[in-house]
Structure formats: structure tokens, C-alpha cells
């Protein structure tokens, strides 16, 4: 059986054209969160990520749905399970992964890690601003 986003948003006999693009974008966002979290889980389980890891698997819809209702200029804070919110606000997945791997190229130069990832440029203030250095220029 083939599952695709087009099959999920297009039902024969119903005109969903007004909502199809929104549904497609939402499903793509949820899928991006799930794939990112599964990759993080795998890396963490193999000992390639240090510290703690709080995944948001199962919470993809709430993160993407909440961020979909925001304007681009809105700011968010999140919880310790904030990867989905970060993705929902438009974060670059490569920089997010670099942050979780404690790399200098991460959003907080590798110092924020999983729980405190932040990106002022996209309006993501992180879960605990006091412990992160917001840096949107690097």
C-alpha cells in the first residue's frame, strides 16, 4: 500500500483545494519532526549525543499545529521537549542537529543542547533563556 500526502489530503468527490496546501504543509512539518526525533533517538542510543534527551515523539501535531497559527514575527518559548516547536518555527535541521551534537555550528554554539535550543532569528526563545546565549548571526 502506498501512502502519500496527496492521498491523505485528497478525497474523491470532495473539493479540498482551499485546504490542501495547508494540510500538506502541516503533514510535512509533522513528518519532519518525527524523522528528526527518530534520528536523534538513534544517535543518542548509540552514545553519540551526551547529556539528557527529551524527545517529542507523539507530540508532532501539537507543536506543528501551534506554530502554524503563529505569525512569522511571533516569539515562542517551549518545554524540555521543544524540538518540534523549533522545527515548527522554521529552524534549519542541520543547525539543530549540530546543536544537539554540541557542535560550534549549532544554534547556541553547542551549549544549549536539546533542552535549551533557541534561535532568535525565527522567534524561538528556547526553554530557558538564562542558560542559553541567543545567537541568530552565527
Which residues are covered by each model-predicted region?
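Cofactor-binding active-site loop characterized by glycine-rich and histidine/acidic residues
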Residues: 38-41, 48-133
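Conserved acidic/glycine
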Residues: 1-62, 68
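Positively charged, low-complexity/disordered segments
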Residues: 134-138
Amino acid at each position: 500500500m502506498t501512502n502519500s500526502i496527496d492521498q491523505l489530503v485528497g478525497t474523491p468527490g470532495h473539493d479540498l483545494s482551499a485546504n490542501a496546501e495547508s494540510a500538506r504543509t502541516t503533514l510535512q512539518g509533522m513528518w519532519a519532526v518525527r524523522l528528526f526525533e527518530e534520528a536523534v533517538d538513534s544517535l543518542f542510543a548509540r552514545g553519540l549525543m551526551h547529556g539528557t534527551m527529551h524527545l517529542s515523539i507523539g507530540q508532532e501535531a501539537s507543536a506543528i499545529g501551534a506554530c502554524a497559527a503563529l505569525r512569522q514575527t511571533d516569539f515562542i518559548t517551549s518545554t524540555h521537549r521543544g524540538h518540534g516547536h523549533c522545527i515548527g518555527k522554521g529552524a534549519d535541521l542541520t543547525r539543530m542537529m549540530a546543536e544537539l551534537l554540541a557542535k560550534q555550528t549549532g544554534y547556541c554554539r553547542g551549549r544549549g543542547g536539546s533542552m535549551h535550543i533557541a534561535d532568535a532569528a525565527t522567534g524561538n526563545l528556547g526553554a530557558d533563556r538564562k542558560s542559553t546565549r541567543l545567537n541568530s548571526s552565527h
